[in-house]
Amino acid sequence: MKVLLAGVNSYIGTHLIPMLLDKGHHVICLVRDKTHFINHHSYAYAVTVLGGDLLRRQSIDPLPGDIDAACYLINTFTQTSEFAALAALSAQNFMEVIGQTDCRHVITLGDINDKASHKAHLNVEDILCSGKPALTVLNTAMIIGQGSAALEMFNILISKTPIVVPRTWIKTRLQPIAAINVLQYIEACLLNEKAFNRKFDIGGPDILTFKQMMLIYIATHKTVKPGIVILPFLTTHLSSNLLNTLTPVSYAEAQSLIENLKHDSICRENSIRDIIAEPRLTFKQSAKLAYETDGTRNEQNMPLLKSN
């Protein structure tokens, strides 16, 4: 299958490429800077690299006409009116160029929590479903994997004693999902007609409070349980800036994570399991896997969860 990826530098995009290659797909990466991409990704030799800024339609290299499917993984979480307009323009240009190919299917990621989602993201979904390809939206809460925004945040929190956490996060209930399971769902949905023109909530098997998740994560990293200090308030902007400054996580991904921590984010339906019944990692398994492979994993060797 010939698959176009936009947003290849996002967390999921970076890990999706080697998985698709491993499954035998022909991967086409649309990037703003071809030289930078080729120099910084070891798998660049195995994919087709096209240049183009989705905010500038004329900069986009011609796409092959025989593209089968596409994944739109551009982050759309920064909540400003100016960014909303840019997010819409990016999606419109994407649909314009993809509409000139044989592409039958587009997959994008969304947010389980409607309260955490915002108009820019919902508008992008409307634009993506306006073209001729079928659209599949996979809504997630917290994604767990080595280098993910969630685990980078946990690492920051537990690196200091005592741990300082805003009060609004402590009792928030979440349904975290392993990054590898997100990748499996994306790959399994590609050109799967049962997934056409549908939205799915995807999550792991656990529903946990943020405090429970933090304690589980501490248990995989520390021999002594540190104390926890609860702050009365911490703004999304400040939290996102701190995470963006102290880790490799982008501001958009950090903001998405922080917004999710304000509200319960639990799957409202599980119909994806009727289509794709892959085994799912628990939060503890995901955290342990990330810890065990920390420092040894790269963009090409994220371990895959094998089906029995």
Language model: regions and residue ranges:
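Mid/C-terminal beta-alpha module of Rossmann-like enzyme folds, strongest
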Residues: 2, 188-253, 264-308
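Conserved Rossmann-fold cofactor-binding substructure of NAD(P)-dependent oxidoreductases
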Residues: 44-68
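Residues at the starts of beta-strands that form the adenosine-phosphate
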Residues: 2, 26-27, 46, 104-105, ...
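Mobile, glycine- and charge-enriched loop segments
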Residues: 4, 11, 59-78
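Conserved Rossmann-fold NAD(P)-dependent oxidoreductase catalytic core, especially the SDR/UDP-sugar
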Residues: 69-77, 81-131, 135-139, 145
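N-terminal Rossmann NAD(P)H-binding glycine-rich loop of SDR-like oxidoreductase domains
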Residues: 3-25, 29
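Oxidoreductase cofactor-interface core, primarily capturing Rossmann-like NAD(P)-dependent enzymes
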Residues: 9, 16, 23, 115-223, ...
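N-terminal Rossmann-fold cofactor-binding loop
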Residues: 30-35, 53-54
